[in-house]
Structures are given as structure tokens and as C-alpha cells.
């Protein structure tokens, strides 16, 4: 048994009887992609690779070609005159090549190209870029065309139509992927392909004279694209642990993916979409940003299929489960064959630290989803022209982007020794900010709340990832990560629904969401203290939960 010190809530306790990272059991076959640890290698300057906790990586069979460290200068023929235009073109080509090499070097750092993380980075960037381009495409219609009352009523109706199926399907995505041997890459590509079809439908129904879309087409397509974006996040979470390089942990992997998505997807993709939208709208009366969406989604579907095949391997995995029942016939991991012989199925309950971090992150996600939709309706209800409304929303969006980037930058450098404690503190901070914004009822208070909420959400998510990596055995880590992401997206949907349904007065909206945050904070604190307000879904479980069998009394420990 663990000592009392190890069972303290929020502390990462050592795992009794768990396979070590240095053991041969956990050594993944992908280590064949890294340099051999022989005598000549030890004498070299490069240190030997760290042992890996990722068992999904198979050998590629060949070493990648060494990348070019510099771009060779472009030479000119003798007697050729270099004009100002030609010099500018050469300089632009050289700068572009250097920028490409810089991005490629960052994307392949720490062995990411061998583990498959680089292949996953590009679809993640494409997903961020699609969201940013869609925001540009819909900005003109939402802020310069539709009436506020019409927007509010129709969005509430279509939100119910599109979000309700997602709320039912999202909890089933994780278990379905656990049972499928082949389907993760296809599911990722399908999330892009369906968005391509929706963008084409919007383009076909675009009215160039008014610069708008029919309401019955606009809102279902826009909300459905949001649902597919969230579905991509859930699907990606089940793939990420399988492409984790051996030299970095899950926290750094997710922070890297988010930073790449923000810089290469949200900022670069949004800027390109804005430029194309401006040119196409003024010259051709066409929705240029939607053409960018079509191009990015097609590229994203293709890039998703280039993710390594070993992400499909699920043999030997034990699915994770949110619930915990003490009276079930539990079975330690050294007796899996007895369970299979008797027809039972092993399940890995989440430990106390994980469930506490999950409740805290869900509470924060409610606030994030609320801030995603509610400020748009508040700005639309404001008695001002479209540019002022767009400026109000731009302030909130900038605060969210800065907070998200700062949170991911900070979380990658934090020592997450007690992640559950950090999650509780972030949840308290976000709840206090929501109450303060309800009292102030001003745009400045909303921007400050958005800034700190975005940063707190990134730090709390990194803490949840740290708990998942430490407190779950390797064979349940990918499943646990997918289950947690599904739950977080449902919490986001709940917050977005509150933002659509409540009245467009700042103090009213923040009062409504504060009531939900207080309930979530109470469950988080109670779970942290080892109890629960909801039976079976709280912290009344050990820090390191043993595996259970779904068949009550199906297996008995051998004598």
C-alpha cells in the first residue's frame, strides 16, 4: 500500500507494482528509429536517447535523410544584370526558404518526425486555420447584415438542432475508438471532409449583392462546422499519446501542438483568409474566405491520412472509465488472463487527482464556451455600427488569444508536481473573475476575465495532462486522454448554450454562468478532499485506482 504521504490529494504518488519506464516491458519498438546506444555512440557528443514510455512506435525501417542546414545562394549568370525587382524576388525567395526551414526544424524537434508527432502537427494547424477562416467568412454577415433579434432566435434553434446530437455522440466517440483497430485517421480526415461540403454549400448560397447568406443555410452550417471542429479535438486526443516522442512528456506535446495551432493556424490562416476575403468581396462579390476554408479542409483531410499507421494499434490496451465502484470485483493488472478466460473486460478507473483535475477543467471550459458565443450577441445588441461591434468582439478575441498563448507558454515551463492543486486554484480564479464581471457589467471587465480565463484554461489543461500521464498506466493513457477530452468538449457546449440562451446584458449573462461555475467549483473542491456531490463521479476513490472488471465477481485473485 502507498503511504499516507502518497495518498495526499493533489500529490503525485509513486505507483505500486507498475511497470517502470526503464524496463523492457515499456520499451516501444519505435526506439529503432533512434541512434543505437553502442560504444561509438557513447563517445560522440550527442547524449544517448532517454527511455521511452510510448510503446506504439514501430520501426520505420530507414533513417530520414539529413536536412539541409542552410539554403544555397542563388547564383546569376555572367553578365546578367540584377534589377531591383529581381533582387527583391531573390530576397523574398531566400526569406521564404529560411522561414520554411525554421518551421520544419521546430516541428521535427525532439524526434517528433520519427515518432509521428510532426505528421499530427499539420492537421492540428489546419484545424485552427479553418476555425479562423470561418470566423473571417462569417464576420461580415453576423455584424453587418442580420438583425440582432433574428440572429438570437435562429441561433438558439439551430444550436439545439446541431449541438444536441453532438452531446449524445461525444461520450460515445472514445469507447467506439477503443473498439476499432482502424479508424482514427479516417475519422480525422472525415471531420475535415464534412467541413469541405458545408463550406461548398455556403458558397453556393452566397448572395453577392447583399454579401450575406440565407439564415436557414448560414446558422446550421456554421454551427455544424463548430461541432466538427470539436469532434476533431476529441479524435486528436486519442491519437496524441501514440505519437509522443520519448524525450518529452504529454504536457509539452500538447503545449507544442497548441502553440503551432495558434501561430500557424489562427494567426497565419486568419490573415490569409482576411486578405482573400477583402480582394474577392470587392472585386468579384465572392466569399473569398470560404474558398480558403475549402482549400485548408482538403489539405487537412490529406494530411490526416499521412499520420503513421501505428496510431491504429490498440492491442493490449485497457479502456479508461470515469466512474468508480468500490464493490466491483476488482482485479490487479498481473491477472488479465483470468479475466479474459471468464468473459470479463478490464477497465481502468481514473484516480482522485485526475477526477479532481477533470472537474476543475470542465468548470473552466464552461466559462470558455460562454465567452466564445456570448460576447458576439452582446456586441450585436449594442446600438452602434458594424465596425464598432466588430471592434468590441475583436477586443475579446485578442484577449483570448493572448491569454491562451501565454498560458501554454507558461505551462510548458512549470514544474507540475501537484497538478490537482494548481487546477483547483485556476478554477477558483476563474469563478471569482466571473462574479466580478457580473458585478461590474462592463466591456473592460469582460476583456480581463477573458484574458485570465484563457490563460487559466491552458494551465489547468496542462495540469490535467500531467495527472493523466503520471496516474494512469501506459496501456490506459490514450483512452483516458480521449475520455477526458470528450468530457471537456461537452462542458464547452454547455457554456456556449448558456451564452446563446441568456439575455444580452453583461451582468445577466455573467450571473447565469457564475451560478454554474460555483456548482462546478464546489464539486472540484469536494473531489479534491476525497468526497463527491455526485455518487461514483467524485474524489471518493484512491489516488491510484486499481483496474476493475465489468463483470461483477467474474474473477477472483488466485490463491
UniProtKB/Swiss-Prot annotation:
> Which subcellular locations apply to this protein?
Cell membrane
Q: How does it sit in the membrane?
A: Multi-pass membrane protein
- Give the main location: membrane
Q: Which UniProt keywords apply?
A: Cell membrane, Membrane, Transmembrane, Transmembrane helix
Q: Which residue windows does the record flag with biased composition (Basic and acidic residues)?
A: 1-10
Any one GO molecular-function label of the UniProt entry: efflux transmembrane transporter activity
The record's Pfam families line, in alphabetical order, gives: MFS_1
Q: Where are the transmembrane segments?
A: 128-148, 155-175, 186-206, 208-228, 259-279, 283-303, 358-378, 387-407, 428-448, 490-510, 515-535
**Which InterPro entries would you find in this protein's record?**
MFS, MFS_trans_sf
The answer to whether UniProt assigns keyword Transmembrane to this entry is yes
Highest rank taxon of the organism: Bacteria
Q: Name one GO cellular component term.
A: plasma membrane
Region of interest (Disordered), ranges: 1-76
Q: Which family does it belong to?
A: To M.leprae ML2143.
This one is known as Uncharacterized protein Rv0876c
Q: Which organism is it from?
A: Mycobacterium tuberculosis (strain ATCC 25618 / H37Rv)
